[in-house]
Amino acid sequence: MTGPLPAPVSLVDIHCHLVPGVDDGARTTEDAIAWLESFRDSGIRRVVTTPHLSASHVAGSWRERIESRYLDLKEAARERVPEIELSLSFELRIDEPEADLSDPALGLGGGALLVEFPQLILPAYPDLMLSSVSDQGWRPVLAHPERYTGIGRSYECIERWREAGVVMLVNVGSLLGDHGPEAERVARRMLAAGHVDCLASDHHGRESRSTSLRMGWDRLAEAGHAGIADLLTSANPAALLKGKPCEPVQGTDLSSPLVKRLRRMVRGGSE
């Protein structure tokens, strides 16, 4: 392949860290704008930036600081990257199951709330933590389920959560091996089982964490799954933001067409 595949110009990234100076994401507004320009050039047209926020601090001064920094970024983006529709939500760390999450401004849109478990570790009572979100009227969207330590040994959790209505949002970087072999293995298992609802970049506005959503689209398309790529990076994220259900995604082998043919030959199948 000599160049990038022709992706649609309507990719939707619902998890990234571009609000400057508030978490481990972008450091400055200029940095964030530069990354938004690169997003635009790769076909992304909708971005929800999701800085970290602990459930125990949803009403504190830290959230006010985040919102102030976001407004500065929004103004700059309106002038310099008008092609991108930018909005603010949060990656809500569930550190307090009793936290009041009634403020609709916390959500991604459409009644969906992006959540994560603390410290990238599968907690002792994950179902209770997720139900504390859904019990307050939200549709939980679990950030990078493939990355939590111990999830590979407790994969049945993913199946159970999906049955309970939790949306599985996988990092593109996990499929590409950026988060280590275990996260890649679980992400590929989820993809093969049809347990991935959406992909997102989890871009952190700096070179060390700069995996883009377009990279995920390209990787799937290169493996012969452009239709699946469209669902995971465009149609399903857009539906989620509108409060509509995600389309079911069939199980997908991320191996290249050549590798698949070789496997069939080894098994004695026809090409």
Q: Where do the model's predicted regions map?
A:
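Active-site neighborhood of phospho(di)ester-bond hydrolases with catalytic His/Asp-centered motifs
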Residues: 12-14, 48-50, 87-90, 141-143, ...
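Active-site beta-loop-alpha junctions enriched in small/polar residues
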Residues: 17-19, 52-53, 89-95, 118-120, ...
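Charged helix-capping and loop-helix junction motifs
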Residues: 28-31, 65-67, 128-130, 153-159, ...
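Short acidic/histidine-rich active-site segments
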Residues: 195-211
